[in-house]
A protein has these predicted regions:
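Glycine-rich phosphate/ribose-binding loops and adjacent secondary-structure elements
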Residues: 109, 121-170
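Non-catalytic, usually N-terminal nucleic-acid engagement modules in DNA/RNA processing proteins
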Residues: 1-123
């Protein structure tokens, strides 16, 4: 079925999730009657390099638009996507560089903890919240991530961190 992907990061910054909600949600705002999936915006935040700081609670980042500071936590990201009214929302995840195994494991664990918090924060029965599998280029970490997330009981899953600096051979 045709589906549109919208990005929470960009919509959060401009025009703002609450404004979109007041205008009737993404479907009405975009004039799209079919399913809409919103990405958490995690990839965009992590691509900001010098404009972001990650900790176990979330991510502090500066807007690429005006330099203003914002804090993404799992709860903020879920609330934003709920306000947007997407049919499918994604948890906040940490997109780590793929080659550093120790950091890939750390980021994977953080993503799992954020996924648990996202599930607790999620309130819309009419919106599916998906978990995101991570683990860099390491097959065993990817398998561990998939097992951990499926045990949490998400209705769907995405594969995160692909095409984030790995070679074709990886």
């Amino acid at each position: 079925a045709p589906m549109i992907l919208a990005n929470n990061y960009h919509l959060y910054l401009r025009p703002g999730a609450e404004r979109v909600a007041r205008l009737g949600g993404l479907h009405r705002f975009m004039g799209w009657p079919r399913p809409i999936l919103t990405d958490s915006g995690g990839f965009q935040v992590f691509s900001l390099q010098g404009l972001r700081k990650v900790d176990d609670d979330g991510v502090m980042f500066r807007s690429h638009i005006d330099g203003s500071e914002h804090r993404f936590t799992p709860e903020v990201v879920v609330r934003s996507q709920e306000a947007l009214g997407a049919d499918i929302a994604m948890v906040l995840d940490e997109c780590a560089e793929p080659h550093d195994r120790a950091y890939a494991r750390e980021a994977m664990g953080r993503t799992h903890r954020w996924a648990e918090r996202s599930l607790r924060a999620h309130t819309r029965a009419d919106q599916a919240l998906y978990g995101i599998v991570h683990g860099g280029i390491f097959e065993d970490l990817r398998a561990e991530s998939a097992r951990t997330l499926t045990a949490m009981g998400f209705p769907g899953y995405a594969i995160g961190g692909l095409s984030v600096g790995e070679s074709k051979e990886d």
